[in-house]
Amino acid sequence: MAQKLDDSTRDEHLAPLMRAGWEMVEGRDAIKKTFVFGDFTEAFAFMTGTALWAEKWDHHPEWSNVYKTVEVTLTTHDVGGLSELDIKLASKMDNLA
C-alpha cells in the first residue's frame, strides 16, 4: 500500500515536478498540471498511454479533456494526500507528453 509523502522527502520529490510545470492544488494535498497538445488526437493518445500505466500501477488520475487540453490532478485518496505513486505517475505523464 502507498504511504503519504513524509516531510523529509516531500520537497525532494516535488521540486523536479514543480520545475516541470506541476503546481500544488489549493486546499488539497494534491498536484495539478495542464497539458496542451497539437490536436484532439494527440491529447487522446496521451490519455491512452497514461491510462495503461495507471492501470498497471493501480493508481488513477483525476482528469478532464477538452479538445487538445488535458487537465490533471494527482493525489492518493487511500492515504489522504500525495504519495510516491503520484510522483511516479506525474513523471511518467511528463515523459509521455
UniProtKB/Swiss-Prot annotation:
InterPro entries: PCD_sf, Pterin_deHydtase
SUPFAM superfamilies xref list: PCD-like (SSF55248)
GO molecular function terms attached to this record: 4-alpha-hydroxytetrahydrobiopterin dehydratase activity
Catalytic reaction annotation: (4aS,6R)-4a-hydroxy-L-erythro-5,6,7,8-tetrahydrobiopterin = (6R)-L-erythro-6,7-dihydrobiopterin + H2O
Keyword Secreted: no
One Pfam family, short name: Pterin_4a
Family note: Belongs to the pterin-4-alpha-carbinolamine dehydratase family.
Keywords from the named record: Lyase
HAMAP family in UniProt: Pterin_4_alpha
BP GO terms, sorted: tetrahydrobiopterin biosynthetic process
Listed name of the protein: Putative pterin-4-alpha-carbinolamine dehydratase
Gene3D superfamilies in alphabetical order: Transcriptional coactivator/pterin dehydratase (3.30.1360.20)
CDD domains: PCD_DCoH_subfamily_b
EC numbers on record: 4.2.1.96
